[in-house]
């Protein structure tokens, strides 16, 4: 390992990066408990970079004004949930041009067959059909690789559905480093401690998702409490009436226990013990109460941020400035190593 390589590793060993798309009016409970809650904890021990991937959002059709509104709303939600701009860097992807620039370099390093094997593209394109599938969806993994590699993070919180993309990112980093010299850290993916996988309320064997078949299966963080309570109380369970944690045989009941445990900090075992002899109505009612206790102050904080758009834009501008500084340093190194003529402007 060269001195330059050692310096690069030392600078980035404590850096973490992740993002969440602005493709809905509200983030849902699965977004928070499965990802953002852990991001908040990571701020204390890592140099954290969190971003809103609006470039990724346009791989499918978006209404311009809706995308703009969802992007600023997404930032307000992240801040209200606990992302602290004093402890992390929060920015919008399109505010840092280096993402698109590095994406092209990485696309040129990716084999067509390699990109064609990405299962998310195959799944989504088969559902949409060739005529409604953009080339941007095909190159999505290379943009994701650029998002990550620009900041030279050591760790990337990642869900199971993104593991293949992270493996491609690692492959591209190693390929570039071996061919041109080390410019990138090869990041490790990890699922943070305490991450909770939340399932659809109407189909508790499927992950809660904004693209789910039934909107009643999703708990949106900004929904009116009455709407969320109704969805919790109509959640699919089973017919035996026994409250037990058994994801395989009682997925609906287990999902409600996980939600309540994650929101209250009470262990699942303690919850199950407390419900001995009780029915599903008690479990659903308590889960709905825990959700309302969480979302009520959240929405108040969210409204404060949304009512001061100037402050929101200031926070994002500061984040973009820092992100650009880090990203441009990486991009300049890449451009030099790959043989681009340096610009003197």
From Swiss-Prot:
Q: What class of enzyme is it?
A: ligase
Q: Report the InterPro entries cross-referenced here.
A: aa-tRNA-synth_Ic (IPR002305), Rossmann-like_a/b/a_fold (IPR014729), Trp-tRNA-ligase (IPR002306), Trp-tRNA-ligase_bac-type (IPR024109), Trp-tRNA_synthetase (IPR050203)
What EC number(s) does this enzyme carry?
Answer: 6.1.1.2
Range of residues in the leader sequence:
none
Which Pfam families does the annotation name? tRNA-synt_1b (PF00579)
Q: What subcellular compartments does it reside in?
A: Cytoplasm
- Catalytic reaction list: tRNA(Trp) + L-tryptophan + ATP = L-tryptophyl-tRNA(Trp) + AMP + diphosphate + H(+)
Where the record places motif 'KMSKS' region is 207-211
Query: Where in this protein would one find the motif 'HIGH' region, according to its record?
Result: 22-31
Q: Which GO terms describe its molecular function?
A: ATP binding; tryptophan-tRNA ligase activity
> Record's superkingdom?
Bacteria
> Which keywords annotate this record?
Aminoacyl-tRNA synthetase, ATP-binding, Cytoplasm, Ligase, Nucleotide-binding, Protein biosynthesis
Locate the residues binding ATP.
Answer: 21-23, 30-31, 159-161, 198, 207-211
* Similarity section: Belongs to the class-I aminoacyl-tRNA synthetase family.
Q: How does it assemble?
A: Homodimer.
Cross-referenced NCBIfam families, in alphabetical order?
trpS
Q: Which function does this protein serve?
A: Catalyzes the attachment of tryptophan to tRNA(Trp).
User: What protein name applies here?
Assistant: Tryptophan--tRNA ligase
Q: Which organism is it from?
A: Corynebacterium glutamicum (strain ATCC 13032 / DSM 20300 / JCM 1318 / BCRC 11384 / CCUG 27702 / LMG 3730 / NBRC 12168 / NCIMB 10025 / NRRL B-2784 / 534)
